[in-house]
Amino acid sequence: VFFDYDDDNLREDALSDLLAISKLMKENSRYTLLVEGHADERGTREYNLALSERRARAVEDFLVASGVSSFNIEVVGYGEEKPVDLNSNEAAWSKNRRAELYFIK
């Protein structure tokens, strides 16, 4: 799930994927979903940690509103610590402003 610069609102292009994940979670309630929030390198470390957690919480809030139990969701914010693209340009930053979702037992 990707986010706009300095924003924790879900984008329209993420909603269908999140609805599909919601459906899977409701059908497989024995699993836990780990939601990892991330930010690009711009901003202070503290700000980016808070922003990345808000992004992860936005995903969690959407899934809970669609019927997934909050008991089955864990969230963590990593700030800028785990970039997928190490370059310092808009193309890289847009890839790093994200939330990643993992199914765990």
Regions found by a protein language model. Give the residues of each.
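Periplasmic peptidoglycan-binding/anchoring modules of Gram-negative envelope and division proteins
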Residues: F2-E36, R57-S70, L101-K105
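Periplasmic OmpA-like peptidoglycan-binding domain that tethers envelope proteins to the cell wall
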Residues: E36-K105
